[in-house]
């Protein structure tokens, strides 16, 4: 897939917004605006992530990709978990033990690191759901029916895992949307066009706090 400058711009804007909402003074001064930004920022990140993940890789390449996610994830979650024992952190550990730290790493996660955990879980399921294809003959033999079957398997595994504390159903849904866009061979710039009036829809979204729930696909 060719580099998409539109996606680069969107990700840059989202990163700036992420930095902004984590400034304590901004959140205290504009709590409603912060909640509005959060309502679309992470769902957009998840859709883009699902769209950009490349599963046309060998097993070794995919392992390297997952390792690059898992290693910093384990380090950061471990450090944050230990810190949460000594400081008032939401959903922190109550006992400094391997079992509680292991629970944070492998099941519930902690702090902002849930996003990396979601990337690892969804990326792994995505890859293995489509792993039946022969990458060397990808464009010759893999039919639309095969793609639909793989998407069904992927959706089913996401649904099952989302019944556990390890994966949020809404996060899985947004990731899946990105995957569907990618597998449909639809170009991002053709699906999401530049329209000036979109800024008015964005302002309206910020005004409608009843749409802040991720479960509302109006996001």
Residue map of PLM features:
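Alpha-helical transmembrane segments and their immediate juxtamembrane cytosolic regions
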Residues: 1-219
């Amino acid at each position: 897939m060719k580099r998409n400058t539109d996606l680069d711009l969107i990700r840059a804007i989202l990163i700036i917004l992420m930095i902004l909402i984590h400034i304590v003074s901004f959140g205290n001064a504009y709590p409603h605006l912060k909640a509005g930004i959060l309502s679309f920022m992470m769902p957009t990140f998840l859709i883009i992530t699902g769209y950009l993940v490349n599963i046309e890789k060998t097993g070794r390449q995919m392992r390297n990709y997952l390792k690059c996610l898992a290693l910093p994830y384990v380090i950061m979650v471990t450090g944050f978990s230990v810190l949460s024992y000594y400081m008032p952190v939401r959903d922190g550990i109550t006992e400094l033990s391997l079992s509680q730290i292991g629970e944070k790493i492998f099941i519930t996660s902690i702090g902002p690191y849930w996003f990396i955990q979601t990337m690892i879980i969804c990326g792994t399921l995505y890859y293995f759901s489509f792993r039946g294809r022969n990458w060397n003959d990808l464009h010759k033999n893999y039919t639309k029916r095969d793609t639909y079957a793989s998407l069904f398997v992927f959706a089913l595994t996401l649904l099952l895992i989302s019944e556990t504390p390890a994966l949020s159903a809404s996060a899985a849904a947004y990731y899946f949307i990105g995957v569907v866009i990618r597998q449909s061979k639809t170009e991002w710039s053709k699906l999401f066009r530049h329209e000036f009036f979109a800024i008015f829809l964005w302002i309206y979204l910020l005004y409608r706090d009843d749409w802040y729930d991720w479960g509302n696909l109006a996001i």
